[in-house]
C-alpha cells in the first residue's frame, strides 16, 4: 500500500528516509498470507537510490541502525519476528555493501541473509559433525551487494546455494545470479519461496512447508558431497 509513496516520495527525490520493516517473510507465522511480505526485498531492490538490508540478529541490527543513521539517502531494512541466538559480534561495525564469512569450507558455498542465517548456521553445526564443511556467508546487504566477495568465492567453489525467507524471484538469489552471470558463471541453487503465496502456521512449520528449514538445507548440501 505504501510502495507508491516509497517510489515517488522517497526514491524519486532521494530523500533521507529510513524504513525499518518488522515481521518480514514467513517468520510472521500465524498472521498468514495477507500479513506475510515475501517480496519486499525484490520491490525495494528495484527502487533507485534505496539501500536494502536484512540483518540476521539483534547485535547486527543494532550496529546497522547506527550505520544507516549516518548514511545520507533512503534505506529499507527488513527485520524478523522470532527471537534468534546472536551470531555476530556486538562490537562489529556494520558496513553497507559488505558480506560476512561465517565459515570457510570447500566445494559448496551457502549464502544466506536475514534470519535464515541462523537456520543455516545451525545446519552447519550438524554438517560439521558429519565431516561435511561448506562455506557459509551471511549477506546482510542485498543492495548494494558485496560483488567482490561473490566473485572470489565463485572462483573457489563448485556450487553456490542462496538461502532466504523470500520469493526466489528478485531477492538474494536473484542479486547473486545477476552479479555472477556477468562476472564468474557458476551453478547457483536458489532456496526460497518458489513463487507461491504464504500460508498461516507457526514459523517453523512454514519453513518446513516451503523447504527452507534446517533439514531441507542439510539435505541439499549433503547431495553435493556424495
Can you describe what each PLM-predicted range is?
Residues 1-104, 108-109, 134:
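Conserved thiamine diphosphate
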Residues 28-29, 80-226:
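Thiamine diphosphate
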Amino acid at each position: 500500500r505504501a510502495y507508491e509513496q516509497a517510489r515517488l516520495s522517497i526514491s524519486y527525490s532521494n530523500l533521507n528516509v529510513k524504513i525499518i520493516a518488522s515481521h518480514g517473510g514467513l517468520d510472521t507465522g500465524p498472521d498468514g498470507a495477507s500479513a506475510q511480505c515475501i517480496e519486499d526485498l525484490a520491490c525495494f531492490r528495484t527502487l533507485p537510490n534505496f539501500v536494502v538490508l536484512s540483518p540476521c540478529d539483534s547485535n547486527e541490527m543494532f550496529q546497522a541502525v547506527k550505520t544507516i543513521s549516518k548514511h545520507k539517502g533512503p534505506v529499507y531494512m527488513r527485520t524478523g519476528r522470532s527471537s534468534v541466538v546472536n551470531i555476530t559480534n556486538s562490537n562489529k561495525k556494520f558496513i553497507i555493501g559488505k558480506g560476512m564469512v561465517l565459515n570457510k569450507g570447500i566445494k559448496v558455498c551457502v549464502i544466506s541473509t536475514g534470519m535464515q542465517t541462523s537456520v543455516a548456521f545451525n545446519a552447519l553445526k550438524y554438517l560439521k559433525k558429519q565431516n561435511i564443511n561448506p562455506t557459509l556467508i551471511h549477506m546482510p546487504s542485498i543492495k548494494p551487494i558485496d560483488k567482490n566477495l561473490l566473485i572470489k568465492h565463485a572462483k573457489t567453489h563448485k556450487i553456490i546455494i542462496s538461502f532466504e525467507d523470500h520469493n526466489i524471484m528478485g531477492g538474494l538469489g536473484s542479486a547473486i545470479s545477476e552479479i555472477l552471470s556477468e562476472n564468474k558463471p557458476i551453478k547457483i541453487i536458489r532456496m526460497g519461496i518458489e513463487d507461491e503465496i504464504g500460508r498461516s502456521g507457526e514459523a517453523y512449520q512454514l519453513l518446513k512447508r516451503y523447504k527452507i528449514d534446517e533439514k531441507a538445507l542439510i539435505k541439499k548440501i549433503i547431495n553435493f558431497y556424495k
